[in-house]
Amino acid sequence: MNFDLTKQQIELREKVRDFAEREVRPVASYNDENEVFDVELTRKMADLGLLGICVPKEYGGQELDTLSYIIAVEELSRVDGSTAATIAADNSLGISPIKEYGTKEQKEKYLPRLCKSHLWGF
């Protein structure tokens, strides 16, 4: 078996690492110390495609695999565990049950909104 990352996974890792250093690191300590949930940062993660990372494109997601999702969480965790937990919770607790078990109508109604940060599932 080949356990190397794909080119797409490597590019995602670099993109999320850059985002974490540029956007998350400067505010992480302040947000943590002041108990701030950074709405704007969460919207930026949605714009980057990190909410709904494994959701099919027809519902507004990135349609990436589970390893890509894990890579994104890991890269955010390097800088701030709370920020990583935000996308982990949204993808796993909010989005995944609808993606896996929702009716077509539920998927059409909720998944695009969850992927674009118009609705949160955490």
Where are these regions (language model features)?
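Intrinsic disorder at enzyme termini
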Residues: 1-11
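Glycine-rich flavin
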Residues: 25-122
